[in-house]
Amino acid sequence: MTKSELIERLAGQQSHISAKTVEDAVKEILDHMAITLADGERIEVRGFGSFSLHYRAPRVGRNPKTGDKVELEGKYVPHFKPGKELRDRVNIYD
């Protein structure tokens, strides 16, 4: 599901709220989450999961076209850990 599809679905379920209002709310939430992570903070949504940053250590990679070695710097990447309730809801193959 894309962000646009999410906005459409939410707006369709909430007929008393305009699509523009839903779009603004979704964008505001995502912007605030990005800012919070950029500040090094963790985000926890009970029953859904948590977002945090994980550090990727520097390493040697390879250019896929040439095969040359490339030094990759260490960096922080966003990480999502689903909560138990979400894991249980999506575990339909038991």
Curated annotation (Swiss-Prot):
Gene3D superfamilies in the record: IHF-like DNA-binding proteins
Instruction: Please name the CDD domains in this protein's record.
Output: IHF_B
- Stated role: This protein is one of the two subunits of integration host factor, a specific DNA-binding protein that functions in genetic recombination as well as in transcriptional and translational control.
Gene name as annotated: ihfB
Give the family this protein belongs to, as stated in its UniProt record: Belongs to the bacterial histone-like protein family.
* Gene Ontology CC: one annotated term: cytosol
| Assembly description | Heterodimer of an alpha and a beta chain.
Q: What is this protein called?
A: Integration host factor subunit beta
Spell out the molecular function terms from Gene Ontology: DNA binding; structural constituent of chromatin
